[in-house]
């Protein structure tokens, strides 16, 4: 897939995931939020909790999941920490990290709290 095609495929996947969160009462507050440490695809809210969402698209859900590396997770953690610094409760703000996997047919699988050990 060319760079431009990949970019638009990623945007389409993010839009599909954002609609799922919005429709389930967890409004998306930011898209492609960028901090010094990295970028977070989507940031949603569920009550007082902040949800950081990484969207991965590939031919299958398994292939999409395999594209998430430890290094990338570390960058997402860093960016999330920067985002939380701007929240009223700072680092004490309730938060979680979801991963949304999108396959070639546009089917979405959301893994809530995916970064939990």
Curated annotation (Swiss-Prot):
GO terms for molecular function: nucleic acid binding. Belongs to the UPF0102 family. This is UPF0102 protein Rsph17029_0461.
């Amino acid at each position: 897939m060319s760079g431009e095609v990949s970019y638009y495929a990623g945007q389409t996947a993010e839009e599909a995931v954002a609609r799922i969160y919005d429709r389930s009462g967890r409004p998306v507050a930011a898209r492609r939020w960028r901090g010094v440490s990295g970028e977070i695809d989507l940031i949603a809210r569920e009550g007082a909790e902040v949800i950081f969402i990484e969207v991965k698209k590939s031919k299958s859900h398994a292939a999409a999941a395999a594209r998430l590396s430890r290094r990338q997770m570390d960058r997402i953690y860093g960016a999330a920490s920067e985002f939380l610094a701007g929240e009223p409760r700072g680092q004490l703000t309730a938060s979680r990290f979801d991963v949304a996997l999108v396959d070639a047919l546009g089917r979405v699988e959301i893994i809530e709290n995916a970064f939990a050990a």
